[in-house]
Regions:
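Class I S-adenosyl-L-methionine-dependent methyltransferase catalytic core
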Residues: 1-123
Length: 123
């Protein structure tokens, strides 16, 4: 059986984009070889369309954050704050750098916690 060619989407390999809000169109790089599978655009778009009426001013929790794209999308769309819980040290550092670029110095709407999400929730 012949393998079909992959579909070209026009996006750089290893990145996801913010769909809407103040950071619309900005990209988050995904480390090559990382064990991270970001939530696809279409799924995020549907999720945030459902949440749109209640999202502004809310506090969000992005568990198993990886790239942090869910929490960053929430911030972009008006959430007051997002906490990101990620166990992998490299992914947590990358997420802190992305938040620094997006939210800027002196803004602390995003907080990265390096922890196992289940243990962190258990308290």
């Amino acid at each position: 059986m012949e393998k079909r060619p992959t579909r070209q989407t026009g996006k750089p390999p290893g990145s996801v984009r913010i769909i809407a809000g103040e950071w619309r169109g900005r990209r988050i790089e995904v480390a090559s070889g990382a064990e991270i599978r970001p939530t696809p655009d279409r799924v995020r778009e549907t999720l945030f369309n459902w949440l749109a009426p209640v999202l502004p001013g809310m506090h969000c929790l992005d568990l198993y954050a990886g790239t942090g794209v869910l929490g960053i999308e929430a911030l972009s769309r008006g959430a007051a704050e997002s906490w990101f819980v990620e166990q992998d040290a490299e992914a947590a550092r990358a997420l802190e750098m992305v938040l620094g670029r997006f939210d800027g110095p002196g803004h602390d709407r995003g907080r990265v916690l390096r922890a196992d999400a289940r243990r962190w929730l258990a308290g």
